[in-house]
Amino acid sequence: MAKEVKFGRTAREKMLRGVDILADAVKVTLGPKGRNVVIEKSFGSPRTTKDGVTVAKEIELEDKFENMGAQMVKEVASKTNDTAGDGTTTATVLTQAIVREGAKSVAAGMNPMDLKRGIEIAVRTAVEDITKRSKKVKSNDEVAQVGTISANGESEIGAMIAQAMSRVGNEGVITVEEAKSLDTELDVVEGMQFDRGYLSPYFITNADKMVVELDEPLILLHEKKLTSLQPMLPVLEAVVQSGRPLLIIAEDIEGEALATLVVNKLRGGLKVAAVKAPGFGDRRKAMLEDLAVLSGGQVISEDLGIKLESVTLDMLGKAKRVSITKDDTTIVDGAGKKKDIEARVAQIKRQIEDTTSDYDKEKLQERLAKLAGGVAVIKVGGATEAEVKERKDRVDDALNATRAAVEEGIVPGGGTALLMASKAVGKLVEDNRDIQAGINIIRRALEAPIRQIVENAGVEGSIVVQKVLESKQANFGFDAQKEEYCDLVAAGIIDPTKVVRTALQDAASIAGLLITTEAMIADAPKKDNGAAAGMPGGMGGMGGMGGMDF
């Protein structure tokens, strides 16, 4: 395949054009008065969104060189979204500002590598300044404020996220789903839930709700299949003597074993229920261990030299209550020791840090959350499917921003933290003229997000920038929603430190690569010689088909 190569200024101009197209489409969504972007879908109604990364992901340009520039900026949005979960539009605006200024400097004959060094020095200084201004999130109200800002001022969403986090803890699983109704609601499942239901409807104790409810049950955890209850008879007799219900969790319970349990349950001799163990393979083993730690029991495993015949009551787990539907099992208030659970949580956290697979990380985080305290589901409602999808985007953003705020703290919002960091960057002095130019590029780029937020609100950006920079108050800034100056933290206009920091670092990283690009290579467009050229003689070769016998 032939390639097309572009060099120097021509390459950078093409790339900058791609950066501008993508950034201009994304940046209209920034701030409380940002506009929507409508995206055509191959089927169904168009999608309306104010989420920067969703807009960025949809953009593919026809010109391959312009498209390379756009794809690099898309990479910034995706990276920021993966790391901090929000701040994608801010990162895109910063990238565009840095690349524009950088391209001008390179065109003026400056050394791109020195410019990049200057950019890196300035970004380090800006990040230190932002981190210094950061303050920890203490109250539930502050959590709600962060959520509200990220959800574009919808306080209902902010309050719901704060409530979910207070119920399941900061480590807990909070998932976002589309509701079937108009209302947005919060559903909290306390305790540990896994997606396996009862193996037989004969175990049901509450026929109205079609659920199995066991109070103060003993829990038998077995890692293999159970086909016969013969080896279990000693422990079953001990359970009957204790008068407590029994929950059996095993890889599977088949044939005679299941039939015997059902018969005993129906005769009233033994209050029992059985479910399959969650997960597959090694993950199943790990989840059984989690259940053992949570319930204060032991996994009955031949690897550990424990046989079913030798199981005693003190090897069984215990819980306050177990509820089983046809799809889920929930164990509430397991009897595991607090220090054992904490040790297990610490172990899973270490595994999360060590793993490189996103899928493994997600599964480990699910396990961590289940151990740490529960699952909350925010069901997002709306009048139409398009509205539900648009709101769900915003709830996802708000949830990610809130987690980031709890992790690293908060700074004044509305682009103010970045603007204030430009003061610290402005104090940097380098002897090398080109490195100094790189520092100045960042100093000017740090103004871009607040300018864009203000301009989206229909106000002149440079006036606001000047007024905020002149102020001596720590949290002074511009409220674009009300179009007035105020103490941003007091007004609840705050951004997570992690989001602001990540947006700047990711933007500078990709922009540095774009500025130092000197050549671009893409597939050359195919030359179209006309379709008929490949078949001379008007398909004469098919003349012999006349004698074919059909």
From Swiss-Prot:
GO cellular component: cytoplasm
Residue runs in coiled coils: none
Residue sites binding ATP per the record: T29, L30, G31, P32, K50, D86, G87, T88, T89, T90, G414, D495
Pfam families xref list: Cpn60_TCP1 (PF00118)
Keyword annotations: ATP-binding, Chaperone, Cytoplasm, Isomerase, Nucleotide-binding
Homology family: Belongs to the chaperonin (HSP60) family.
Protein name: Chaperonin GroEL
Organism taxonomic ancestry: Bacteria, Pseudomonadati, Pseudomonadota, Alphaproteobacteria, Hyphomicrobiales
